A protein has these predicted regions:
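Enzymes that bind and transform nitrogen-containing heteroaromatic metabolites
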Residues: 1-186
């Protein structure tokens, strides 16, 4: 059975973006890029919520024209060629999305996990991650904690989320002090 992997960047004060929604603070050094690329390579489908999707589709289709960062140059072609699913009740169709899930999220994700293939990779976004956590559908949590205090922004998980015990599966320090920790569903 395929796994659903959650891969997210957060600040040490637990925010996934800054007070004004900025996402200019993650430090994608060589080691962290390699970690991210390994997660992508074991996945054959990327999953996004609407908010993260809007940021991804605004950058990655033409990323090489906007940045010459090694991570960007390696990830952009992979992003373009990998099937993408967007969970949204407000988006009906998008040229870059393979599929849009508007209703029956639990049923559709459960069905995807049962299908043959590589893993599903959920990147960022607290709303969709919170809902999929509540539904018990996320198998692995990969959390990159960056050495920055943002002082506000969206929390890693929505306020009021149910308590959930996880099993520690490993941790490592990458590049300039980014700590990546993996937890598995207990």
């Amino acid at each position: 059975m395929r796994k659903l992997i959650f891969w997210v960047h957060t600040s040490i004060d637990g925010h996934i973006d800054g007070p004004a929604g900025e996402f200019d603070w993650p430090m994608m050094g060589e080691e962290l890029s390699a970690y991210s690329e390994a997660l992508c390579e074991r996945s054959d489908t990327f999953l996004y919520g609407r908010g993260v999707w809007e940021g991804m589709v605004a950058f990655w289709p033409n990323a090489e024209k906007m940045s010459d960062h090694p991570h960007v140059l390696k990830f952009a072609p992979l992003w373009r060629s990998t099937p993408k699913i967007v969970a949204s009740t407000t988006i009906e169709h998008d040229d870059w999305a393979t599929e849009v899930i508007g209703t029956d999220l639990a049923e559709r994700i459960t069905d995807l996990k049962r299908q043959p293939g590589a893993d599903l990779l959920l990147t960022g976004g607290s709303g969709l991650a919170g809902e999929l956590t509540r539904l018990g559908l996320i198998d692995e949590y990969h959390i990159a904690v960056h050495p920055v205090v943002l002082g506000g922004g969206r929390p890693l998980f929505p306020r009021g989320a149910d308590r959930l015990g996880l099993r520690f599966a490993g941790s490592r320090v990458c590049d300039e002090g980014v700590v990546v920790t993996r937890y598995d569903r207990a």
